[in-house]
Amino acid sequence: MMDDDTELRTDGNSLLKAVWLGRLRLTRLLLEGGAYINESNDKGETALMVACITKHVDQQSISKSKMVKYLLDNRADPNIQDKSGKTALIHACIRRAGGEVVSLLLENGADPSLEDRTGASALVYAINADDKDALKHLLDACKAKGKEVIIITTDKSSSGTKTTKQYLNVPPSPKVEDRQSPPLCTTPSDVELKTSGLASPPSEKDDDFFILQTGHQSGCSTSKVLNEPGSPTRKVSSLKRARLPQLKRLQSEPWGLIAPSVLAAATRQDETHGTSTDNEVIRSINDVTFPKRGPLSRTNSIDSKDPTLFPTVQEQVLKVSASTPASWKAAYEKGQAPHPRLARRGTLPLDQEKSGMCPPGPSTLKDPASLKLLENDLYDLDIQPVGDPPNSMSLESGKGPLDRKKLNSSHLSLFHGSRESLEVVPSTSPTSVRRRPPHLLERRGSGTLLLDRIAHTRPGFLPPLNVNLNPPIPDIRASSKPASPLASGLKSMAPVAPNSPKRVDLRSKKKLLRRHSMQIEQMKQLSDFEEIMA
């Protein structure tokens, strides 16, 4: 049969014939005469493959290893594959060419990871051929390239089930039970308890438990002690585990193991809480008391401060307004009469404004008409061509409700005020100084900004982050500069304390620019009106 295969393999190729016969001189003459060393037959087999396959031996033939070495020295390619995908290395492993031939092929660049059409490499064929010498050379070559090789083949046991055998420089185990080698010393977490027949009921079967180290109970003293019969702990744990069928594991699934410490914890919980009923559980839950959370307090609120140490602005305003001279009150009543009702352009409804005003104060401020005028003075922000906001005297005498109104709406400035709204813009025009009191609201597109000078500059309170940390403390009892030309015309009606020029300059620097566009005709009318009033 070998002769028939040889005739078919050589296919009239003299080089393949010479190699198969092992004629080294003839092979050298053919190669020196111009024969192609990698020429193949109809199966795709080259001269190097034929040298690995042939078993012809006679008096004139040379050894297989010498022929392979000569072909490799003459630049024969060891990684050429035939039509079935096999290389010269695979053929050498299949035909058991020996470790020397395999070593020569590997040294000259043969790739042990190349696979044929069936997906098997030279490693698989070496294992199937039981060629340990060739397998050793293959493993050494793979480790030299930084590859760890683990080859697993499947065989069938006597019962017909597939068993797994691992070949890694060690002979395969004859039995399935010998696959697991015992460790040097087992730990308590690696040992599964198994009780004697006295501790378990007769109805229980031995397959209810999974023994991790079968046949290796003499690994160390710990496993011996835990496997002694008669221990009450083992009896209880075995009974509890018998009630848990979901903890059964197959012998072929060691990754499904559960540590005995987990089972012991479950056993202790069952012993402790086995007699408790649902009512007891509900009672225990009801008996648990949770600490009550105190009411949330605003860190920015001045009401959270100690009133004995830091009096609030409301109390200070009440004291000042209660001690207001009678001449100021009379001037306020006289000054409110000639003022026309200005257009209402507030941002809050009327009900909220009324609720925001605090009634305590001087008896003069309890008049409904004066409250109405104060509300209009506070929320009428845009200057009309025919009138201006009331004079500083009326605003000064009504500081109590105004400051309380500022405190009630101070949160609006926290949410809607931007850093741009608190920028200090110096005002050089005297009309802007007279037109705008320092404590009025300013209308912005995003909301209402409250410039609360008194609340932010009183000693004992933390100033806001975006306000000057060292502003001058204004005197509440001192009147500011008149806010409008109408107020300048009423100077003769009531005595007004003279203002300090320094204070006027400081307040004028703190003014915010009014975002109000006026036509040229309105500006002319306003200038004419100021000249008439002057």
UniProtKB/Swiss-Prot annotation:
Keywords: ANK repeat, Phosphoprotein, Repeat. Residues 159-205, 332-368, 384-403, 480-503 are annotated as: Disordered. The modification Phosphoserine is found at residues 301, 446. ANK repeats lie at residues 10-39, 43-80, 84-114, 118-147. It comes from the Eukaryota. Belongs to the ANKRD34 family. This is Ankyrin repeat domain-containing protein 34C. It comes from Mus musculus (Mouse).
